[in-house]
From Swiss-Prot:
Reactions this protein catalyses: D-sedoheptulose 7-phosphate + D-glyceraldehyde 3-phosphate = D-erythrose 4-phosphate + beta-D-fructose 6-phosphate
Function: Transaldolase is important for the balance of metabolites in the pentose-phosphate pathway.
Name the UniProt record assigns to this protein: Transaldolase
The gene coding this protein: tal
Similarity comment: family membership: Belongs to the transaldolase family. Type 1 subfamily.
Amino acid sequence: MTSKLEQLKQFTTVVADTGDIDAIARLKPVDATTNPSLLLKAAAMPRYAEHLGNAMKQCQGDIGLACDLFAVAVGKQILELIPGRISTEVDARLSFDTQAMVQRGERLIGLYEQAGISRERVLIKIASTWEGIRAAEQLEKAGIQTNLTLLFSFTQAVACAEAGVFLISPFVGRIYDWYKKHEGRDYQGAEDPGVQSVSRIYDYYKTHGYKTVVMGASFRNVGQIESLAGCDRLTISPELLGQLAEASGTLERKLEPGRASEPRISLDEKSFRWGLNEDAMATEKLAEGIRQFARDQEKLEALLTELA
């Protein structure tokens, strides 16, 4: 019988959430995503030692540039194995500075183009803060497509759609983690708050004709993935991709256009900030995610500095 991974690929674009070249070659996803935490793991792999050294040689003492050069080198190597796109993230410490994020996104695209990679194969990942969404809006108008990450709330999703961003990455597992901790119980299938969040966003986007791609991210188990079968894209860790590849049985499509959704709404900055503030889970998880990515960025910089 066809594996659940192959069945999933029939109605959802499968993306690998990793910088592990071997896993990508084995699992054959369409796209791949990276972030500072995954790049830090990649930096510890012997196969990337040459990329680290080259980044330091080319950066002229600018450690931030060295990190971008390393990210692009990893991204280019991944693109040799996949037909689609790579997502590369802007320094999370810039998450509240619109113009700095625009400039960093433009630099990353410039580095990819210098490496012979067209911008059509790259998504610039940016945190879904108000400032990040505004930066993405500017980049999209300049022909640079974006992936809005660390998205935990319907408010963030609405603002991203209104800004015309190419893709959003709502985080299923981290939402699940928060509710499991605070409610003291487990969740399965359609009752999982993370699954419910992505389902709501998907239905809203399809009902109102938004072109923004919904890519569920941050999964804790195969059940969450199966409950979102039919979502535009799902970015999945090699471990869970492996489990799906080994699983048999029928996988039913759960999300599809045409399901009912709520009326269209519009958000200005005040209503965005209030809506996010009213969602304790999203507020905590957005701040925590930015801090974690910033810490891993600093660790990567320290690693590169040691090579200087």
